[in-house]
């Protein structure tokens, strides 16, 4: 059975693909950001003793590999092709390292690793909170009994509307869950679009 691209399949299939893309983006982003910032800082700080040049070159090559990984992820989640970048052989020694450092595409790959990280943090947080929050609020009536009860433990409904009714508390949280789940598909789609457009803008020859 042919696989349906995430960007063109049924809503549920596309939603799972986009949610997986966003949630997997943070751990990958942490690793990529660490490589980019650490390698760049170490390379620049040691340029005076020449060891910085191969460190920078190695960092840029690693950035290129990580950028290709993101290109594959973007192509998979959008269902649109995203050509990989295959740099020519840089050569060995100082000449090869210098050739890598002079390659503009390598620097764009590195910039993407750094710039994309804050967005990955935001999209991960919003996607996780919106999805799990919606499920948790919808099922509030099944676990609200475990919350501390008493004069010093006021629920959101009581704080907002001065209503301590348990029915009102359950009703408010259930409606909140319905609203979150009713809007989760467009929210996830918007977050995915923001992240993939940034990738296409920095990792391809033309913006999406």
Model segments located where?
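Hydrophobic alpha-helical membrane-embedded segments
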Residues: 44-79, 181-186
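Membrane interfacial helix motifs at helix-loop boundaries and amphipathic/re-entrant anchors
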Residues: 37-54, 136-173
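Short, structured motif recognition centered on aromatic/hydrophobic residues
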Residues: 15-40, 73, 97-131, 137-142, ...
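Hydrophobic faces of alpha-helical transmembrane segments in multi-pass integral membrane proteins
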Residues: 24, 28, 51, 115, ...
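Cytosolic/matrix-facing juxtamembrane and C-terminal tails of multi-pass cellular membrane proteins
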Residues: 1-8, 159-170, 177-208
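Membrane-cytosol interface motif
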Residues: 76-84, 202-208
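Membrane-spanning helices that line or support transport/gating and their immediate boundary helices
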Residues: 65, 69-72, 76, 141, ...
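Short membrane-interface loop/juxtamembrane segments of multi-pass integral membrane proteins
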Residues: 82-115, 153-164
């Amino acid at each position: 059975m042919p696989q349906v691209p995430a960007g063109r399949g049924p809503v549920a299939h596309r939603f799972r693909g986009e949610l997986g893309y966003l949630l997997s983006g943070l751990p990958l982003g942490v690793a990529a950001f660490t490589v980019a910032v650490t390698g760049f800082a170490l390379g620049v700080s040691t340029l005076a003793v020449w060891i910085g040049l191969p460190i920078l070159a190695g960092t840029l090559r690693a950035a290129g590999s990580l950028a290709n990984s993101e290109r594959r992820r973007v192509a998979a989640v959008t269902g649109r092709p995203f050509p990989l970048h295959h740099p020519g052989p840089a050569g060995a020694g100082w000449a090869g390292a210098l050739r890598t450092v002079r390659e503009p595409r390598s620097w764009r790959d590195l910039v993407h690793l750094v710039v994309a990280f804050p967005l990955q943090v935001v999209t991960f947080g919003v996607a996780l909170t919106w999805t799990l929050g919606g499920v948790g609020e919808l099922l509030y009536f099944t676990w609200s009994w475990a919350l501390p009860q008493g004069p010093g433990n006021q629920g959101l409904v009581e704080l907002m509307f001065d209503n301590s009714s348990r029915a009102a508390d359950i009703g408010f949280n259930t409606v909140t869950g319905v609203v979150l789940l009713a809007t989760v598909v467009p929210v996830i789609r918007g977050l995915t679009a923001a992240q993939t457009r940034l990738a296409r803008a920095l990792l391809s020859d033309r913006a999406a």
